[in-house]
């Protein structure tokens, strides 16, 4: 843990975690910082001194790794379905990703488990005052990336994420019926 700050509501806070993954030769193969909002165990406990890590605004280009031997000389733009390349985009351009998707409870919970997020608020509808499961932000960001394929079909790999946010909560709707059985 490299940072901690209480939110203005006093009931939760943000925890920054630095994760490094090493292979069998002790070489770094994964290195990232993420932040998570968590509830305080005791909402009445005084706020700890805030420690907000100083993070780089972007991954420096020299840290971006393209796999050795990657070769796109035979790449077929017609088969990919879009002709657009790097030079076809302009700073500030808006791309309309026309596809949409409904976020499903089962997919959200599976993805949340795969990311090893065990926060009860994502699984137990009784854990929130409004009785709704909160959709895990990593799932929302993953869905956004998947939908971005339409408009960025020739983007072959993600070499870094410089940041990401979903500014508002996302929920699945629970449908119920009051219809009586009239057999």
What are these regions, as identified by a protein language model?
Residues 175-182:
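Conserved small/polar residues in nucleotide/adenosyl-binding loops
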Residues 10-18:
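Short aromatic-glycine-enriched beta-strand elements
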Residues 2-4, 34, 100:
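Short, surface-exposed secondary-structure boundary micro-motifs
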Residues 1-10, 22, 162-174:
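Active-site beta-strand->loop segment that positions catalytic residues and contacts the acyl thioester
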